[in-house]
Amino acid sequence: MATTRRADMFTADGKPSDDDPRENGPTLGDERTTLVEALRCQRLTLEIKCAGLDAEAMARRSVEPSTMSLLGLVRHLAEQERATFRVLMAGQDMPQLFRSETHPDGDFDGAVPDPGVVVEAWDAWRAEVDFATRFVAEAPNLDITGNDPLNKHGSGGGALSLREVLVGMIEEYARHMGHVDLLRERIDGRIGQ
């Protein structure tokens, strides 16, 4: 397993490039612009790190005993996007995509090396990201709130502002992008920033 130059990870098609697409966004802006751009870069990192992999590689659990795989992370992040923006913020009554009460780890356990499962995961993730992007763009400000019955901290009870939700999603992605780095390197030696 040969190590590939870091610059090779900066393209969605897996071809070498000195152009990191995450550097195309605004570098100056207000709070909303800054948060939205940080989240966009994290989402793009997920796509970049998974580019060029077949279903077998996407589903590979290469850090045993963990059931984590790149495909499982795509499914997990689709679930997080849905729960955060559709359910918590928009108040939609939506079923979970891959998990259930009887199968709480369905996002990872159901990440099998089937091309159809990979397509389904990416389609779900992109649909949830598209919804979230529209929701944030149309929100009048970052102070709008959603209700999270599990959030009992602070003076707002279960209320969370869009600002806090964006910070939380950036944290969620950032945590998992470290996992993605290691999983991808174990698959084919590719590394990147």
Language model: regions and residue ranges:
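Short, contiguous alpha-helical
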Residues: 2-18, 22, 32, 36-106, ...
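Acidic/histidine-rich alpha-helical segments that form the ligand environment
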Residues: 105-146, 163-169
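Active-site rim elements
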Residues: 29-35, 116-119
